[in-house]
Regions:
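Short, well-ordered beta-strand core segments
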Residues: 87, 134-135
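Gram-negative bacterial Sec-dependent N-terminal signal peptides
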Residues: 1-19
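Short, polar/charged alpha-helical segment
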Residues: 40-62
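Residue-level recognition of the GNAT/N-acetyltransferase active site
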Residues: 32, 117, 138
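Acidic, polar ligand-binding/catalytic clefts
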Residues: 55, 59, 64-129
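Solvent-exposed, acidic/flexible segments
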Residues: 46-51, 68-72, 121, 136-140
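Immediate post-signal peptide segment of exported/extracytoplasmic ligand-binding proteins
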Residues: 17-45, 121-122, 126-134
Length: 140
């Protein structure tokens, strides 16, 4: 499960409109586009809240976003390798990630929680350790 703090979005959000003009440059943006309502694909087009935020940033700094759908478990390595200019996707800022990428200030923070079936209410960590219950999460 990932805490939603968006990373590496080019700290331009805090800059005045006149501070940057990228001259229409195309910015390649890596995203795991499977996280609605933040980023998802509908009718072959990347849509969502993050897409709208990036569109506004690009409007202000004169750039064109090019969304590159990428698997979550390799997204930071691909960014560090130069495959994109930035990553815009649900991201938890960690010390490990901070060593390989630069983070912007977060523009949204969403709480995390654990979901479980009603009939498993009151389950303990021992139930997971014994194999009576299973836990699923996303890699990366």
């Amino acid at each position: 499960m990932k805490k939603f703090i968006v990373a590496a979005i080019a700290a331009s959000m805090a800059l005045p409109v006149y501070a940057a003009d990228l001259g229409g440059r195309v910015l390649n943006i890596g995203s795991d586009t499977t996280y609605p309502p933040h980023e998802f694909i509908e009718d072959g087009v990347v849509k969502g809240f993050d897409v709208d935020v990036v569109a506004e940033i690009c409007e202000r700094i004169n750039c064109t976003p090019n969304w590159v759908t990428t698997a979550w478990d390799g997204i930071f390595a691909a960014l560090a390798d130069g495959q994109f200019d930035m990553v815009v996707s649900g991201v938890t800022i960690t010390d490990e990630r901070d060593k390989i990428v630069d983070f912007s200030d977060p523009y949204i923070i969403v709480q995390q929680g654990v979901l479980m079936r009603v009939e498993d209410e009151g389950a303990t960590i021992d139930a997971f350790k014994s194999g009576d219950l299973r836990l699923a999460s996303q890699n990366g």
